[in-house]
Amino acid sequence: MLDLNLGILSTHNEDEDCKVPTSIFIQEEDSINPSNDNLSLITFGILKRNVEILPPPPPPPPPPPPSENELSGPGNEWLDLSSMQRNKQETLVMKKKSRRGPRSRSSHYRGVTFYRRTGRWESHIWDCGKQVYLGGFDTAYTAARAYDRAAIRFRGLQADINFIVDDYKQDIEKMKNLSKEEFVQSLRRASASLARGGSKYKNTHMRNDHIHLFQNRGLNAAAAKCNEIRKMEGDIKLGAHSKGNEHNDLELSLGISSSSKVRILEPADYYMGLNRSVTSLHGKPLPGYLPITEIKPLKTVVASSGFPFITMINPSSLSLSCFDP
C-alpha cells in the first residue's frame, strides 16, 4: 500500500542516505508565522522509499521417503509386494547369457547347421575369431557330438556343450595327446569316412559292390577251373588245372603250350606264328614264322638349289629276312 502521509523534512536534521525521513507535524503556530528561519519542505514519504524486488520463494522440499517401519505397516503391504516384483524382473533381465551366442536356427543343437545344397549336417566352432570346420555328418546328433568334443578340447570342461561332460570321459583322455590341428583333422577324417560308407579305422571302407568277393571264398577256385586270369603275388598265370592236361606251365605271352622240356624264350621266338597250319589265298602254305621287313634309314641330302630334302638310300634294295628257329 502507498504511504500518503505528509511529512516535513528538515534540511539540517535529514541525511540524504536515510531511508526513513524525520517528519514534523505542522502546527498551527508555525504555519501562521512565516518568518521562521528554518525552512521546511513538504514531501511524500513514498518518494524516499527504496523499493527492493525480491526473488520468488523456493519451492517446498519433497516429502521424505517412507521409512522401513511405515513400509512394514498393515496399511502399506501393497508397496512391499511391488518392490518384490521389481526385484524378480531385474533378476530375469540380469540372468547370465551364453558366451557363444544363440543356438543355430536350423538345428536345436549348438554349433550344428543344416545345408540344403549338400543335404548334410555340418559342425563349426569359433576359435580366436575364426570359424573352424569340423566336418559334415549324416545326422544332427553326430554333428553335435563332434562339436562337443571340439569345444572341450578348445575351451576346457567349462565350455557350453550340447550334452553332459561325463559322456566324453574316454574322448578327453585321447585329446590330451593331440594338438588342436590334429584333433580337427581326426574329426574331419571321421566325417568323411562315414559319408563314404567307411569305418572308423584308417584306410578302411565299405563297398557294397565288393562284398561278394569276401563272402564266398570258393570264387577263386571256380575262376581257376574256368581258365580265368587272376592276380596272385604279382605274377599273372593261367590257372588251367584239368585232369587231361599234362602241360600246366602255359605262357600268357603267346597263349600256346610249351613242350615238355622247359626252355628260355629268345627275342626271335616272339615272332613265331600262332598257328602253323595257316594257308594263303593261293593255296600255298605259309612259313611258320612271320617275315620281318628291313627298311633302310633315311638320309638328308642337300639339293643344287641349296634347300635340303629327305631321301631314302637304295629304295629298291628292300630285302626280306626271316628268323629260323
UniProtKB/Swiss-Prot annotation:
Gene3D superfamilies: AP2/ERF domain. Keywords: Activator, DNA-binding, Ethylene signaling pathway, Nucleus, Transcription, Transcription regulation. This is AP2-like ethylene-responsive transcription factor SNZ. It is found in: Nucleus. GO terms for cellular component: nucleolus; nucleus. SMART domains: AP2. Belongs to the AP2/ERF transcription factor family. AP2 subfamily. The keyword Transcription regulation applies. It comes from Arabidopsis thaliana. GO terms for molecular function: DNA binding; DNA-binding transcription factor activity. Residues 52-79 are annotated as: Disordered. Probably acts as a transcriptional activator. Binds to the GCC-box pathogenesis-related promoter element. May be involved in the regulation of gene expression by stress factors and by components of stress signal transduction pathways. Repressor of flowering. The gene is SNZ. GO terms for biological process: ethylene-activated signaling pathway. Induction: Repressed by miR172 after photoperiod changement. Residues 54-67 have a biased composition (Pro residues). 'Schnarchzapfen' means 'snoring cone' in German. It comes from the Eukaryota. Residues 108-164 bind DNA. InterPro entries: AP2/ERF_dom (IPR001471), AP2/ERF_dom_sf (IPR036955), DNA-bd_dom_sf (IPR016177). Pfam families: AP2.
